[in-house]
């Protein structure tokens, strides 16, 4: 597995990052909570100008890598747009399917459903894609862009397994970007905040927390890269992507918990970016399934198909 990204993809990520910073970075997400129309007024035109929504994550290596890194850049500012949902749709279906949601069981609301025309929802338990009809906005403190939904008939022509794998992969890169920003905020605070005449990062408790969150982030980045490599080779199975999801959730819990501890009360203030990042991550961390339910799905997948890793596990049913 190559551990470095194609240079063209890295250059594209830099352009995407500059564009999102010009929109205000995390402030755009904060503003969009107060006025949902800012998603279409500001985020969508920027994405179209970059040509990002038209890229194909199943395309050639440079294009696919550019998608992953651009989604990571979007996550770094918790961009208020369903980018992973849109890009998880194969290029040949985008005229008929506007986005992909992942669900587990019955749902009554989904994030950004009001923006996605002719979206589908894939049930992880049944492996079936169904049409989504969006209703009125139903925001909640930890689900700021939710809308009510009704799931309809099965969507013909959608390869549920394929779009599920890509959506999980894109989610992981989006979360990686958000966690990288959270980690940077914590590290900067530990370096700059003075206590008893020295930076708080010199104290053992803070150093341990910074080490823990850095290790969790590095582990997620490495696993996301490996999962992308497996998908590119056509070797990824459901257990691989579910393992990535479980790692994503656990890494987020570690980075956010330790980040808040490093920041103290400041990190809980509404005006601080860490609070916004934490809040905007909750929908992807809990939908379609949280840590316990995702681990259960992973266990069932391993039982059915085995798992190739450092210590391979054979299927047993």
Can you annotate each of these PLM segments?
Residues 9, 172, 203, 210-213, ...:
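Hydrophobic packing residues in well-ordered alpha-helices of helical domains and bundles
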Residues 76-184, 188, 308-317:
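FAD-binding core of flavoproteins
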Residues 1-77, 302-317:
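Amphipathic, small/basic residue-rich leader segments at the start of a protein or domain
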Residues 2-3, 28-37, 184-214, 225-240, ...:
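Glycine-rich cofactor-pocket loops
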Residues 1-2, 266-317:
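Glycine-rich phosphate/cofactor-binding loops in nucleotide/flavin-utilizing enzymes
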Residues 176-183, 210-213, 217-220, 224, ...:
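Alpha-helical transition-metal enzyme core signature, strongest for iron centers
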Residues 12, 16-22, 126-127, 145-158, ...:
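Long, well-ordered alpha-helical segments
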Residues 236-267:
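Charged, glycine-rich active-site and insertion segments that engage polyanionic ligands
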């Amino acid at each position: 597995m190559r551990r470095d990204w194609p240079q063209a993809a890295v250059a594209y990520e830099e352009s995407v990052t500059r564009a999102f910073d010009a929109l205000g970075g995390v402030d755009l997400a904060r503003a969009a909570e107060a006025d949902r129309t800012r998603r279409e007024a500001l985020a969508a035109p920027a994405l179209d100008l970059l040509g990002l929504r038209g890229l194909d994550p199943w395309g050639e290596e440079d294009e696919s890598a550019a998608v992953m890194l651009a989604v990571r850049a979007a996550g770094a500012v918790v961009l208020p747009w369903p980018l992973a949902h849109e890009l998880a749709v194969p290029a040949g279906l985008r005229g008929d399917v506007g986005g992909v949601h992942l669900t587990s069981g019955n749902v009554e609301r989904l994030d950004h459903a009001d923006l996605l025309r002719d979206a589908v929802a894939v049930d992880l338990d049944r492996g079936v894609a169904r049409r989504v009809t969006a209703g009125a906005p139903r925001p909640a403190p930890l689900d700021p862009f939710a809308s009510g939904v009704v799931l309809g008939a099965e969507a013909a022509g959608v390869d549920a397994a394929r779009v599920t794998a890509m959506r999980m992969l894109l989610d992981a890169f989006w979360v990686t970007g958000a966690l990288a920003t959270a980690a940077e905020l914590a590290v900067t605070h530990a370096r700059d905040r003075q206590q008893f005449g020295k930076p708080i990062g010199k104290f053992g408790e803070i150093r341990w927390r910074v080490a823990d969150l850095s290790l969790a982030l590095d582990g997620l980045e490495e696993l996301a890269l490996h999962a992308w490599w497996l998908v590119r080779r056509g070797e990824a199975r459901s257990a691989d992507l579910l393992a990535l999801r479980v790692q994503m959730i656990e890494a987020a819990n570690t980075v956010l918990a330790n980040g808040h501890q490093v920041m103290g009360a400041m990190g809980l203030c509404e005006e601080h970016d860490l609070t916004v990042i934490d809040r905007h991550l909750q929908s992807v961390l809990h939908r379609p399934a949280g840590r316990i339910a995702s681990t259960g799905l992973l266990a069932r997948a391993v039982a059915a198909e085995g798992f190739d890793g450092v210590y391979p596990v054979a299927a047993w049913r």
